[in-house]
């Protein structure tokens, strides 16, 4: 893994910082673990924009990732590491002893040829997946389930991890990188170690066109719009003089947006406190 700063041969190259990983496989992905992925442009089934600043970008093929890791007590070896355009982390192609292949999130410090295994009482080793109740307190884990058998949902992006703070027969307490403290069932599975490609956060696109390549459209300020488009729009010169709001007139700057009361009981400390 190397961080490369491009030479300023043009305005578009001047600020570019790349992350180069020579360990990544340069061929085509494993065809049996691919599926079609169509673009939405941020629109729903009615054609209305539900998520702004999305559209365009290079075509992508979805890699089917095994987030459940439920093929128990069968050793698998790391065949290769691959780039995945659908996520910030890299992925690893693993080959089980029975001949089946799967994609998993590539953990940090794992190498080609290393072995991983999942199960109830497997060794505490990077890349192994097991129930949280069997993991030592204080361990760093990733790909953590929120419900048993649903598949990992927490700590899946590049460089992310969760620390296991406490555990009893029913629930485990996790400390997320955001500062949030959360409970989850101790039967939920997690993978030992951190997610790899932690240098992803150091990458600088360097120009507007690079954002368009990955499907990100421009973010326009409300004050630069007309009154018909945004509550902040209009006025002679740079007038504002109001409380900041969203394009739909709802209060912003600190207003709580979380509405899922059903899972509120699992959050012991919010990330904003």
From Swiss-Prot:
The keyword Protein biosynthesis does not apply. Keywords: Ribonucleoprotein, Ribosomal protein, RNA-binding, rRNA-binding. Residues 253-263 have a biased composition (Basic residues). One of its GO terms (molecular function) is structural constituent of ribosome. One of its GO terms (cellular component) is large ribosomal subunit. Residues 224-263 are annotated as: Disordered. GO terms for biological process: cytoplasmic translation. It comes from the Bacteria. Belongs to the universal ribosomal protein uL2 family. Part of the 50S ribosomal subunit. Forms a bridge to the 30S subunit in the 70S ribosome. This is Large ribosomal subunit protein uL2. The gene is rplB.
């Amino acid at each position: 893994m190397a961080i490369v700063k491009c030479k300023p041969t043009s305005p578009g190259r001047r600020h570019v910082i790349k992350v180069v990983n020579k360990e990544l496989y340069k061929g085509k992905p494993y065809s049996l673990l691919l599926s079609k992925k169509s673009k939405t442009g941020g629109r729903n089934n009615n054609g209305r924009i539900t998520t702004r600043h999305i559209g365009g970008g290079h075509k992508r093929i979805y890699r089917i990732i095994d987030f459940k890791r439920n093929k128990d007590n069968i050793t698998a070896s790391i065949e290769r590491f691959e780039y995945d355009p659908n996520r910030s982390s890299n992925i690893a192609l693993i080959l089980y002893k029975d001949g089946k292949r799967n994609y998993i999130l590539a953990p940090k410090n794992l190498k080609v040829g290393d072995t991983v295994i999942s199960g109830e009482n497997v060794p505490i080793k990077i890349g192994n997946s097991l129930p949280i109740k069997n993991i030592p307190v204080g361990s760093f884990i990733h790909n953590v389930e929120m419900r048993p058998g649903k598949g990992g949902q927490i700590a899946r992006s590049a460089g992310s991890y969760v620390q296991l703070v406490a555990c009893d027969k029913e629930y485990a307490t996790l400390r997320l990188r955001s500062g949030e403290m959360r409970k989850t069932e101790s039967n939920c599975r997690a993978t030992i170690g951190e997610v790899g490609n932690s240098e992803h956060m150091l990458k600088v696109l360097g120009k507007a066109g690079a954002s368009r390549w990955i499907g990100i459209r421009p973010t326009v300020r409300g004050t630069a719009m007309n009154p018909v488009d945004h509550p902040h729009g209009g006025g002679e010169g740079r007038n504002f003089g109001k409380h900041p709001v969203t394009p739909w007139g709802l209060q912003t700057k600190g207003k709580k947006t979380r509405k899922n009361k059903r899972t509120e009981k699992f959050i012991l400390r919010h990330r904003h406190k």
